[in-house]
Amino acid sequence: MCTEQKPNLLKLSQLKMVLRALGYDPRNSKVQEMTRKIKDGRSMVMGWHGEKDYMDVDELWNALQSKDDEGDSTEDKVTTEMRSAFKLFDPESKGTITVANLKMVAKELGETLADADFDEMIREAGGDNNTGINEQQFFEIMKKTCLY
């Protein structure tokens, strides 16, 4: 992340990787927003390092503080979006997504997949072919794949 030439600076282009290393799971839109805030905040900082493609620890810290301050409303919005997506896969509101649900959505989208592919999707999300996956498992796999 840091280089020998700039040991006290981190590349802005690596902000998402830095956030993941710190235990965050940011969406691309949030990373872009944080990058913009870092760049915009520089005009107010005395002693700015002068490297436009880099950030220092203070800039990262300030960005993390603003992320944490806004976390609840952003998290609520993401949860609402994921819940809406879950309902698209669970039209009967059973609380689970089954292989049959995945097949139905694939058919609606014009996708042709083998049965083994649907089974693998359910297993990858932590479910089994008989019971499918619940909402929490759906949320977790969506976050892992960076779709939310």
Swiss-Prot record:
GO cellular component, one term: nucleus
Molecular function (Gene Ontology), one example: calcium ion binding
Gene3D superfamilies xref list: EF-hand (1.10.238.10)
Gene Ontology BP terms: centriole replication; microtubule cytoskeleton organization
All residue ranges annotated as the EF-hand domain in the record: 77-112, 113-148
A Pfam family recorded for this sequence: EF-hand_7
Keywords: Calcium, Repeat
Protein name: Uncharacterized calcium-binding protein R08D7.5
